[in-house]
Structures are given as C-alpha cells and as structure tokens.
C-alpha cells in the first residue's frame, strides 16, 4: 500500500475507504498469482496424461506385433491350423478355467477395492488417531452352566413295586440284604393294621416282638417318665418304620421283652404294616447264613449309628453302657458237675435274679479233682458253687428303661457296688452261707484256689496272683475256663470239645493292655475269671483331649463277664482300649478260633450279641427306637427347601450336596458334606424351615436324629448342651471368617464354602496311552506322607474277595468290604479299568471326586468312554489332570480347548511327571519298580504332593498383597518360603502381588522369577517412556499403552488356565461396584486391571461383560490371556486407565481398593493354611484435633510459617484415598484375626510406592526378614502346620497293617462254608507271568524282602497286583521253612525256667497252632501266611529267651494232642 496516497486521502477527509481499498487490492493480487500457478499445473498435467496414453498404446502395438510373429512361426512349423478341431472336453476345461480366473479377480476386487476397502481404510486410520485396537481377542472359556442333574434331586420313583412292598423292602433293609425268595417269605407274615386318630399302636406292657411300617398317616412315638409325664421321641411318617434292633436280638435269643417306657399312638388315621419278628426265626432256621448276616448288620449299626451319634456329637461316653455289674450265672472255676445246657444258661441269664459271686468251695471236689483227668472237661472235677439270693419282686427279666432313672455312674465308677455288698452281708441266709464257704476254703491246706474277694471300691482281686499259679493245678483252671466260656457261648456239655483247644489262659498284672482302640489284630473274647478289667475310650473332644491326654473310663468288667463281642461280630477293629485294673486271670478265645467254632455252631452269634446288648444302658435302648439308619441312592433328597425341620442327619458314608433355589429359579451350591458331618442341625435347633435342599451325590448312609430324642437327651444329660454349643460355635466362627468373600459375582463354584476333602477318589484314563498305574502309584506315594491311604484295583479286589465278587449276589459283601476300607483310611484310590467294566462302574458309584487323567501334549478330543463317565456320575465332581513329561521341559498350553470340550469338569490340574512314569514296562516290572520307589521320601514340592494335599483338604495358599515397588519384597519372601521347606499349592495376588504371584505360578524357579521381575522394574524407571504415555487427564494421567506393553512382554499371550499352580487375582469392578475374582482368562489383562490405581491408570474394560475393573486392593488387598488380568489388577485409578474386560466389557481397576490381602478368598477356594504377605502402605493415624471448624487460610499459614508447629490434617486427595480404602482396612483386620492365616508384614515402610529403582534392596529386605521369621516359627514349633506331614519318619510295618488285616469278615460266608475266595488259580497265576517276557525269572525278583516292600506305605498294601502278592506268598513259605529249621536247631537253655515262663510258652504255642490251622483251611491265603510268619518269629524269640528242653518237649506233646483233636473235628 502507498503511503503517500494514504496521506492524500486523509488530507481530503475521506477516511472510510482507505482500509477497504487496500484490502481489495491485496486480494486481487493474490488471486491473480494463484490463477497463474493453477494454469501451469493444469498444463503440465495434460501433457503428462497425453504422454502416458501414447506410451500405453505403443506398448500395446508392440505386444500385438510380437503375438503376430509368434503365430506366424507356429503356422510355419505345424502348417494351417484352420483344419484342427477343438474337442468338447478341451473346450469345457478351457472355459471352466477362464471362469474361475474371472471369479478370483472379482473376489479379489471385493477385498481390495470398493466401498468395503475404503471403509476399512478409514477405520484403520481412525484407530491410529483414537488409539483403538482391532478386536482380536483370544480363545476364552465357555461359560456353561452345570447340567440340571448336578443341582437337582431325583424325583421319579419305582412304579413297578407296590407301595406296601416298597416300604417293606426299605424298612427291613436295616437288617441287611435279602434275596427275593426270603423277602417273599417274610411278606407272607405281614399284617395290615388300621388305626384311627388316638388309637395305640402299642403301649407299655405290650410285647416288643414286631416291626411296624407306616404305610399311610402319622404315628407319634413317645416315652413315659417316672413322674407320669411324657416326652415325644419322634413322629413316624409314611414309609418310615418303628422297631428296635436290640429287641430283635432279644427275640431271637429266646428272651422276648416288653415295652417298658415306649408308647406309639396314631396322630391321624393310619395304616400300619406289622411284621412279627418270629417270621425271621422261621427263615433263619432254614438259612443260618442269613441269621449271621442280620446279627452282623445289627452290630455294625449299633457301632456306627448309635455310638457315633451319641458319642461324637452329643458327648456321651460312659452313659452308653451299664457301669454296674450285670447279674448273671457266673462261675470262676466251675466244673462239669454244675454245668448247664445252652437253653438253661440263657434263661437263667435273662430271667434269674441278681447273682452273687461267692468264694470257692473245694471241700467235696478236691479228691475227685486230683484223681481224674481234666483234659477234655467232661469228667468230674473241682467246681465252684454259685449261690443266688432269694428272688426280689422288684427285679425281673430286665430293668426299667427310662430317661428319668438316676445316672448310674457318670464318672465311670461303680456306685452300685456298696449296695451289692450290702445285699451279700446284710441278708442273713446269704451272709451265713458266705461265711461258711469262706471257712471251708480256709480249712483247705493241701490245695488252695485263688479266692476272689470284693474290695470296697468294687473291684475283684486275687490275693495270691500272680504267684497263684504255683499252687493251683492249671488243668483245673483250664477246665473251669472251658466250661465258663462254653456257657457264655450257649454251647451244651457235648460241645465242650469244640472250644477246648482254643481256650487260652493268661495272668495279668495291673495296667496291662490287652488291646488298644483301633487295633484289629488282637481281637478276642475275654472272660474274666478273677480280678477286674477296665474299658477305656479316647476323648473325641479336641479341647478336652489337649487338656487331658488320658483315655476316658467307660466301665469295668468283673469276674464272670465277657468283653470283646462287639468287635468280634462286626469284624472290625476294637472300639475300646482294655486294660487290667488289678491282678487278674482271664480266659480268652481268639477271633480265628471263634469263627471256626461258628462254622460248627452258628447260633453262638446270638449269645455273643445278647452279651453285648446286656451291657448297654437304658439310654441306648430308647435311642434305638428313635434313631434311623437311612440309605440314599445317588440323586435322592434327604430333605427339600421350605420343608419343616424336625430332625438332623449324620453322614456315615458318602457325600451330600446342599443347593439353594433363589426366587428367580436359579440354583446355587451352598456346601458339600462328607463322612462325619452334621447336616440340618441349625434349622432343627432354631425351629425354622429348611433353607436348602440336601441331596446325595453318591450312594450314602445317614443316621437320622429326631428332634424329640434330641430334646429328651438334653433334659437328661446337660453335657449335651455344652457339646452342642461348642460345635455350633466353631461352625459359626468359621462362617463369619469366610462370609465376606463368598458372595462375589466373579467367584466360581469353588468360592462357595464347599469342603475340598474327599474320602474316595476314582482315577479314569482318557485313552489307553495314559500311564494310569504309574500315576496312581505316584499319587499313592505322596498321599502316604499325609496319612493312611489305600489303592484298589479290580485285580486286588478279586484277589481278596473272589473272582465272582462283582456279581449281584455279592453286593452286600463288596459294599461292606469297601466301606470298611474307607473307614480305615483317610482316602481310598479307586483305579478304574480302561473299559466300562463292572469295576469301573463301581468306582463311579463309590467316588467323591473323579480324576480324569490325560496327556497334555495329545489331542483334547473327548472319547466315547469319557462321555459314559459323565452319564454314570452326573452329580459327582470331576476334575481334569493333564500330565507332562519332565524331559521335554514343555509348559502347559491349549488348556482352554481341553476345558471347553468338557463342560462337566469343575477344576483342572497340571502335573509334571518324572521319566519313570512314561517308561513302557510290563505290569510286573512296574510293581517291582515302585516297590523301591515307595521306600523313598516323597518330594513335598512336586505336583503329585500338591494334588495329594488338595484331595485331603490340606492345601497351602500364598497371598501376596499390593504395595507398588514394595512388592519386590515378595520375591525375597518367596525365596525364604522355599528354603523353609514350605510348599505352595495355590497363589493369589492383588496389584503388584498379582504380578509377582503370576510369575511364580508360571516359572516356579526363583532365579527366573527374580530376573523377570527385575527387568520389569527397570522398565518402570524409564521416565521418558512414561512421558510419551501422558494423555489429557479426563479419566487418568496416562493412556496405559506403555504400561500394557511392559506387562504383555513379561507374560506373553498366556492364559491363567495354563499356569502350573492354581492362581487367582482380584480386581475392583467399578461397573458393578464390587470386587471380582479371576481364575481364568487372559493373564496380563487381569494383572493390569489389578494394578489400575485410580487417577493414574484408566480402568480396564472386562472383555467378558464390559465392566470397568480397577485395582482390587480397594476392596481386598490380599486375595483368558494371562497378562490382561495382571494388567487389570494393576490399574491404579488416576494413573492408568481402567482396563475393559474383553469378555463382558466391565471396567476393572486395582484390586487394592476392595481387598488388598485376599486371604479370605483363598480360604474359600479351598486352602486350609494360608501365608499372607502385606506390603501395602500404612496411613498416619496421629492427626491434629482442629476443633469444630477448619479454615484453609489457617492451614496455609501453618504450612508456610516456619516458626509455628506443623499440623497433620489430611488434604482432599488423602481423604478420597482413605475413603477408597475403608473396605480394605476392615477386611485386613479380619484376616489378621483369623486362625487359618499367617499374616506377615516385612519392614518396608521407608520405601515409596514408585521406588522401582530399589528393587534389589527391597528384595533383600524381604528375604532377610522372611528367613528370620520362619526360623523363629520353626523354633517355636509353629512351622509344622505347613509341612507337618513330611516331617514324619518312614512308616514302620508294625504300625500299618497289610491288606489282609483289613479284609472284611463276612460271617455268613464262614457259617455256610462257601467256597474259599482266597484260593490261587494256577492258570491265572502264570498268565500274567507270560506277559512279563521272562522278567519274573530274574534273580532279583524272588529275593525281594517282603518287609522291605511294606515299610514305606502309611496305608495298606492293596497297591500290589496279583503277581506281586503271589510272589509274597512264595517268599512267606520260604521264610516259614527257615523259621522251622531255626526253631528245631535252637539249643535247650537252662532247666531253671519258671513255671510261668512254661505256661506262656504253651500259650504261645497254642496261638501258633491256631494260626497253623488257619493256614491249612485258607488254602494259601496271604493273610494266614503273614500271620504265621509273625507267630514263627515270636516263637523264635520265645525260644531264644530261655525255653528249655523240657518246655519244648511239652509243647511237642501238646501239638500232637491238638492235631489229633483237629483231625477228629475235621472228620
């Protein structure tokens, strides 16, 4: 613009057009310049286009010329082509290829050009601008609901069976299994009774001789007290029965009783089926084996149901038996003069008045006793005169059974002794007779017997014992013992020769233990001749057991009484410990001898059972009317939701599942109950309706305890209330400690309070390639370090119970035998066959959990056999076990494919196997290999030990809390834990703990974990990368891209399912406002979510449901592809953005906001013992009290004025942070006070949250602190809770019985002389040897020491196959021959051996003879040979201790006598 023109214009006064003119001029110049430029570019473009078209046309002309030249050359070579024909086949081929080429071009254009191509290009550009990512989410686990049968009970019934017959069948099942002909015979005796409301079914003084089954209506059973009041015991509904099994024994033994206190009355119109007990008597006459089995079942029910319920749960011990002496006909040295038949002895026992044991009157029998042989007990000899006081009208066949009777002896002492003593001395005739007999005995100078005296405390002593054997002819004592035991067994005089060879005598000093509780070897029937025995039982109350380690006294056994009949009839171990209370003499018969007598005289079981019943207290008889024994098949419901709660249940065997139905119809598992658990007790006590439905997972047995009986016992015995309060307090305390973490939306099924302790485990192979036998051996080896365990295979079961044991006729015997094995072991392993055999189906029915074993590096497809497993056991929990060879160093991968193909699997395990598992060997070589492996100590850190602890409910969990850079201390603590020998079975973490825990679960090597953690910490110190990640702080300060990259580089695309150790992380779901537990999915994403601290990182969006997840420490700071959930667990709010879950879209933040130490979550997932490491920061609680109001200007003045004292007042961010961690602090306090968690906090408070550069220093602090901490725990004895199972010495043979010692004794088989199932088939014996390819002939095979093989097994020796057992038999026979040679070559010792030593040697020889006889009858059984070896060793020891030549000669003479007696008996 010209300045002069502007000045002129301004001088002329027209200022309004100056600026507009200048602007127009400037614009016109610019437009002109631009137009010239566009014209130049346009011209250049036209010239370029013309040149391009000319070039393309020139190229086309050149190509045409070349084609013409090539055609001309072809024409010149082959002549004119116009005469050639284009065949149809060639034409079709030519045009087909041409069309396909066009289709390819068209499809290529669709993906490379057009609208779709442009749209994708725009989307790619938008992602670059908006930092979006392509949706290439990895494979995720399918969320499949369990099948309906898993949570629903079976409702359908049996329509083919009439209701009356069905109720009849179910009711008499308590007597055992009856075959169809016998059942039909029993049905012929049934009667139908129609009762109106108010009618009596039976009342007091009515005969107790029937079984009543309610077909319709309801019956009330109540008792009458002495004061005239009544108390209801139970209400019998449709299908239930009213009977007393103890009365059943009374009727069969010929002593029918009457109802003393029990009455049954109809509540409404009812129809009742009556089955007289005499009907069983008719059946038993033709089928003695059925009688034996019924008596055995009744005794088993008495021990398992009555004693279990009253003792373990109600705290009753001494109240269950008669503490006073049972009055009966007793003879301490009775001879054949006063002997009676079995009928007379039984009637005298039942109907006779109280008897008094008087001293011996040997005046008249001394001479005859000296002159006659007493070997057989049939001649006359010395007898004991037993007198009775006059009958008392107040005492008859049985005393009154009422709960109102005074408690006889709660402390175990005999209060009734003084009364009995007063009866003896106070009654004139009896007192005179007593003194006369005493004087007559005192006048006997040449031969005196042991005088039984009654001391003031009620015990019976033998003043001259034990030296009395020097003055009494032992043959007279032997004859007296034979006659007494004959009467106790109900045998006649003619049957004395049957038991005489088996009766043994023993002199006891005070405090000599005859048998201990749980011992199955030394079971005998003991008869007290002189002195007193005391019966004890261990204290079931854990608190009292710690305070008082002595056993509890139950009752005394006085002269003339027997003990041991219960264990003899049940065939199980002794339930009591029996000791001598004073100098005593006893006569006893061993179990093997009793069973041999039983084969000839089956009815002795009635007398043995009657002896057990006589000892029981009136309380037990009344409980027998009320307690029910319930059998439930799989799927049957015990009770249903909203039903009335009038009883509680005790699980005797099997497994129960509790399911709650929500108002919307959704079902959820509440809990599971195993053997010994109490079900429904809370609803019964609070008198509320059932809150859940409880059903049987597998075939189960339960004891039903009615509310009426429970109330009656409470009123009579207040100790029951104390026991119940203690039981419920422990249950409520445990529920309070686990309540907070059980209801999380993200928690799986395992998060419910389900008991992960199994009694039976079935092992099923997926394919034939799975080495199932070595796998079972390895698992068995690891379980032996925890407790007694048993391994069962089809071969072992057939070896023990016979080849036809899986047939339907042997159902009772097989079931009882398996139940006995489960009772004796903490866990039983059922190794299934590779096909769906009868044994495999039995394993499915018996299993609490099924382990499906497969090879992790093979195909994940589901086989046909595996689908049948799910069909047969729909309600049984199934877990997948994947095996990996150690040599390949392979890591688990593709686990999601395995789980998605098997929606019925609830949990999976990765197991790293040693080389020997995958070595292909014959069955015999495998057994020989593991016979040596079992001698070694198992590795507590192996995957097999981890699986063993999970199955037994002893898993050890490690919880790592959040704390930023202070999390480096976790690495040092991990190293200290490893050096302390503490195994880690489960890992959970929050925030930085999620990262460190995931590294440990992935690598399991402390060196590799340290290196990766150090590299990640170094990346976090590179601030320039963090500066590049800054973004506009709307949601967070950083975008999170670089942070995600660091976590993804650490883990890669690994899923949580692929980790070696079970792992979980916890995040805060800000979409649903709760914490979430992640046990599957992308690892790095959920670790990132758990580290998303608010304000720094944006929440992670959960890809499952779209929820926003933050750091889980906000709610619980100690708790797909792995890195995603690690990233989600580290999403610090405000620093990193929340992580969006790829499954549901929820936003996830750091888990520290809800639970910074999720030990409660770990406990709910099944960990029994937990180590929780907290590295979080601690808030300052010492704040300034500024009054009612606060001025910010005053705070500013205090802050900037250096001459004033500083004040501690939280600022706004600090207040927001404290509010966010309110839930976390409360959760942390509950964890510190729990009894299942060991809370540890290293001294790392001086380090800041972002001090990642001090990684090594913080790690060393954690290591030093952890090492000292665990050393102090070991010194204090508190470290055993984490590795107590592996500090035991190798189990010894004497403490762990072999397989045959645990064999179920079927008395019915003994009585009816069924074919022996122990016989070895020669063809079967060598069939397996042929498959061994000659390995059995190796010299190391037959030289294996049997005892060396049995040393390492804490359980039973069921883990050997038939071949190995047969080799043991051969070895036993060789050892036996060596023993015989060594015994014969033993030189005689000095002739000064005492008479007592001679008698003990004779008794030992008697034992040896009985075992020898058992070997002959068992036809080579392993049990007999093992017992024979033991007896031969004891025989050898006895000979070494000083048995002279005279003693050996006497023993040889006794051998010949007994052998001749045995031959006569056998003929």
Curated annotation (Swiss-Prot):
Subcellular location as annotated: Endoplasmic reticulum membrane
Modified positions (Phosphoserine) in chain numbering: 450, 459, 1205
Membrane topology classification: Single-pass type I membrane protein
Residues reported in the UniProt entry to bind a nucleoside 3',5'-cyclic phosphate 1: 174-301
Sequence motif: DGA/G, positions: 1111-1113
Domain PNPLA: 958-1124
Residues binding a nucleoside 3',5'-cyclic phosphate 2, per UniProt: 488-615
GXSXG (motif): residue ranges: 989-993
InterPro entries: Acyl_Trfase/lysoPLipase, cNMP-bd_dom, cNMP-bd_dom_sf, LysoPLipase_patatin_CS, NTE, NTE1_P-loop_dom, PNPLA_dom, RmlC-like_jellyroll
Active-site residues, as the UniProt record annotates them: 991 (nucleophile), 1111 (proton acceptor)
Biased composition (Polar residues): 1382-1393
Function summary: Phospholipase B that deacylates intracellular phosphatidylcholine (PtdCho), generating glycerophosphocholine (GroPtdCho). This deacylation occurs at both sn-2 and sn-1 positions of PtdCho. Its specific chemical modification by certain organophosphorus (OP) compounds leads to distal axonopathy. Plays a role in the signaling mechanism between neurons and glia that regulates glia wrapping during development of the adult brain. Essential for membrane lipid homeostasis and cell survival in both neurons and glia of the adult brain.
Family recorded in the similarity comment: Belongs to the NTE family.
Protein name in the entry: Neuropathy target esterase sws
């Amino acid at each position: 613009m010209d300045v002069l023109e502007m000045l002129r214009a301004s001088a002329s006064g027209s200022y309004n057009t100056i600026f507009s003119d200048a602007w127009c001029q400037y614009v016109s110049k610019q437009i002109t310049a631009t137009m010239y430029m566009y014209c130049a570019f346009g011209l250049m473009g036209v010239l370029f286009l013309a040149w391009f078209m000319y070039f393309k046309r020139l190229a086309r002309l050149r190509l045409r010329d070349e084609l013409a030249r090539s055609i001309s050359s072809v024409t010149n070579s082959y002549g004119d082509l116009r005469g050639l024909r284009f065949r149809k086949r060639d034409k079709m081929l030519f045009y087909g290829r041409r069309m396909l080429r066009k289709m390819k071009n068209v499809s290529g254009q669709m993906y490379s050009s057009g609208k779709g191509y442009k749209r994708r290009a725009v989307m790619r550009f938008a992602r670059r601008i908006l930092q979006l990512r392509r949706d290439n989410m990895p494979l995720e686990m399918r969320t499949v609901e369990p099948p309906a049968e898993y949570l629903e009970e079976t409702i359908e019934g049996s329509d083919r069976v009439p209701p009356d017959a069905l109720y009849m069948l179910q009711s008499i099942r308590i007597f055992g299994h009856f075959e169809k002909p016998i059942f039909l015979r029993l049905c012929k005796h049934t009667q139908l009774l129609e009762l109106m409301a108010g009618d009596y079914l039976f009342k007091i003084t009515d005969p107790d001789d029937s079984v009543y089954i309610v077909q319709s209506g309801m019956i009330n059973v109540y008792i009458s007290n002495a004061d005239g009041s009544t108390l209801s015991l139970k209400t019998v509904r449709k299908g239930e029965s009213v009977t007393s099994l103890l009365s059943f024994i009374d009727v069969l033994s010929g002593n029918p009783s009457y109802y003393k206190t029990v009455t049954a009355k109809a509540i409404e119109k009812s129809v009742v089926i009556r089955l007289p007990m005499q009907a069983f008597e008719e059946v038993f006459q033709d089928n003695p084996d059925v009688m034996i089995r019924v008596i055995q079942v009744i005794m088993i029910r008495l021990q398992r149901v009555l004693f279990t319920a009253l003792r373990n749960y109600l705290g009753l011990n001494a109240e269950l038996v008669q503490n006073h002496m049972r009055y009966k006909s007793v003879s301490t040295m009775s001879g054949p003069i006063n002997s009676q038949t079995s009928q007379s002895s039984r009637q005298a026992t039942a109907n006779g008045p109280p008897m008094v044991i008087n001293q011996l009157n040997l005046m008249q029998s001394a001479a005859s006793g000296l002159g006659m042989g007493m070997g057989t007990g049939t001649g006359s000899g010395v007898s004991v005169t037993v007198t009775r006081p006059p009958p008392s009208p107040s005492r008859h066949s049985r005393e009154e059974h009422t709960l109102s009777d005074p408690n006889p002896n709660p402390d175990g002492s005999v209060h009734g002794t003084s009364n009995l003593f007063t009866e003896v001395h106070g009654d004139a005739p009896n007192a005179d007779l007593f003194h006369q007999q005493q004087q007559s005995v005192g006048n006997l100078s040449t031969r005196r017997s042991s005088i039984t005296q009654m001391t003031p405390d009620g015990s019976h002593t033998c003043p001259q014992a034990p030296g009395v054997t020097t003055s009494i002819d032992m043959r007279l004592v032997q004859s007296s013992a034979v006659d007494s035991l004959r009467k106790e067994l109900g045998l006649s005089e003619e049957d004395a020769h049957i038991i005489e060879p088996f009766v043994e005598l023993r002199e006891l000093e005070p405090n000599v233990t005859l048998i201990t509780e749980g011992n199955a070897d030394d079971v005998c029937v003991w008869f007290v001749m002189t002195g007193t025995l005391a019966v004890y039982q261990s204290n079931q109350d854990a608190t009292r057991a710690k305070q008082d380690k002595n056993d509890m006294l139950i009752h005394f056994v006085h002269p003339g009484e027997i003990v041991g009949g219960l264990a003899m009839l049940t065939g199980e171990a002794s339930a009591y410990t029996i000791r001598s209370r004073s100098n005593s003499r006893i006569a006893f018969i061993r179990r093997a001898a009793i069973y041999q007598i039983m084969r000839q005289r089956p009815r002795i079981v009635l007398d043995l059972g009657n002896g057990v019943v006589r000892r029981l207290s009136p309380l037990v008889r009344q409980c027998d009317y009320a307690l029910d024994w319930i059998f439930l098949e799989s799927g049957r419901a015990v009770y249903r939701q909203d039903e009335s709660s009038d009883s509680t249940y005790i699980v005797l065997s099997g497994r129960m599942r509790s399911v709650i139905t929500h108002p919307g119809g959704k079902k959820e598992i509440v809990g599971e109950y195993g053997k010994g658990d109490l079900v429904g007790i809370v609803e019964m006590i609070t008198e509320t309706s059932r809150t859940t439905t409880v059903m049987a997972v597998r075939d189960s047995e339960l004891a039903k305890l009615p509310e009426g009986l429970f109330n009656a016992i409470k009123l009579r015995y207040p100790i029951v209330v104390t026991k119940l309060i203690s039981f419920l307090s422990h249950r409520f305390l445990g529920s309070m400690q686990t309540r907070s973490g059980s209801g999380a939306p993200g928690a799986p099924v395992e998060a419910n309070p389900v008991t992960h302790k199994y009694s039976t485990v079935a092992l099923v192979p997926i394919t034939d390639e799975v080495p199932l036998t070595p796998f079972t051996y390895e698992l068995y080896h690891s379980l032996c370090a925890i407790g007694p365990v048993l391994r069962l295979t089809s071969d072992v079961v057939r070896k023990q119970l016979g080849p036809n044991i899986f047939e339907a006729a042997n159902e009772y015997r097989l079931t009882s035998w398996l139940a006995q094995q489960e009772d004796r072991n903490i866990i039983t392993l059922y190794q299934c066959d590779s096909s769906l055999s009868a044994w495999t189906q039995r394993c499915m029915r018996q299993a609490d959990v099924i382990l499906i074993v497969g090879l992790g590096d093979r195909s994940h497809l589901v086989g046909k056999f595996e689908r049948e497993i799910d069909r047969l056991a729909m309600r049984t929990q199934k877990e997948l076990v994947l095996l990996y060879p150690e040599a390949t160093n392979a890591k688990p991968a593709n686990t999601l494919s395995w789980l998605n193909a098997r929606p019925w699997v609830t949990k999976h395990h990765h197991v790293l196997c040693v080389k020997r598992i995958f070595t292909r060997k014959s069955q015999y070589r495998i057994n020989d290999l593991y016979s040596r492996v079992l001698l070694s100590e198992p590795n507590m850190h192996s995957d097999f030990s981890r699986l063993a602890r999970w199955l037994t409910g002893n898993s050890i969990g490690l919880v790592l809390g959040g704390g930023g850079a202070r999390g480096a201390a976790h690495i040092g603590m991990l190293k200290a834990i490893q050096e302390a020998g503490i195994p880690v079975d489960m890992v959970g973490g929050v925030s930085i703990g999620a990262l460190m825990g995931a590294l440990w679960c992935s690598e399991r090597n402390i060196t590799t974990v340290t290196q990766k953690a150090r590299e990640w910490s170094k990346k976090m110190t590179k601030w320039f990368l963090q500066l590049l990640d800054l973004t506009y702080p709307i949601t967070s300060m950083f975008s999170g891209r670089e942070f995600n990259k660091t976590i993804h580089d650490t883990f890669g695309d690994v899923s949580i399912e692929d980790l070696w150790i079970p792992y979980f992380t916890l995040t805060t779901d800000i979409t649903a406002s709760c914490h979430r537990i992640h046990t599957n999915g992308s690892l790095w994403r959920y670790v990132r979510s758990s580290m998303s601290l608010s304000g720094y990182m944006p929440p992670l969006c959960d890809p499952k449901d779209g929820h926003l997840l933050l750091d889980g420490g906000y709610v619980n700071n100690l708790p797909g592809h792995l890195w995603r959930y690690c990233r989600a667990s580290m999403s610090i709010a405000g620093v990193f953005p929340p992580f969006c879950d790829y499954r549901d879209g929820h936003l996830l933040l750091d888990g520290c906001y809800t639970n910074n130490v999720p030990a409660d979550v770990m406990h709910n997932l099944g960990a029994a013992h937990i180590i929780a490491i907290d590295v979080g920061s601690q808030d300052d609680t010492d704040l300034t009290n500024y009054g009612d109001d606060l001025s910010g200007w005053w705070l500013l003045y205090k802050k900037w004025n250096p001459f004033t004292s500083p004040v501690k007042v939280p600022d706004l961010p600090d207040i927001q942070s404290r509010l966010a961690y309110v839930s976390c602090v409360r959760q942390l306090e509950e964890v510190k006070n729990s009894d299942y968690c060991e809370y540890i906090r290293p001294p790392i408070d001086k380090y800041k949250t972002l001090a990642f550069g001090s990684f090594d220093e913080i790690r060393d602090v954690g290591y030093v602190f952890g090492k000292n901490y665990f050393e102090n725990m070991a010194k204090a004895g508190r470290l055993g809770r984490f590795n107590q199972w592996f500090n035991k010495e190798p189990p010894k043979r004497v403490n762990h019985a072999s397989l045959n010692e645990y064999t179920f004794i079927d008395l019915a088989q003994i009585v009816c002389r069924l074919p022996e199932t122990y016989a070895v088939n020669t063809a079967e014996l060598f069939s397996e040897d042929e498959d061994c390819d000659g390995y059995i002939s190796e010299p190391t095979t037959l030289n294996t020491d049997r005892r060396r093989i049995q040393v390492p097994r804490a359980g039973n020796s069921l883990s050997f196959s038939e071949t190995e057992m047969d080799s043991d038999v051969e070895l036993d026979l060789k050892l036996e021959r060596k023993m015989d040679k060594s015994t014969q070559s033993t030189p005689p010792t000095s002739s000064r051996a005492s008479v007592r030593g001679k008698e003990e040697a004779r008794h030992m020889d008697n034992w040896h003879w009985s075992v020898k006889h058992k070997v002959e009858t068992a036809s080579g059984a392993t049990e007999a040979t093992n017992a024979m070896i033991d007896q031969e060793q004891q025989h050898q020891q006895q000979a070494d201790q000083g048995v002279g030549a005279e003693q050996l000669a006497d023993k040889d003479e006794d051998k010949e006598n007994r052998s001749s007696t045995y031959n006569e008996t056998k003929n």
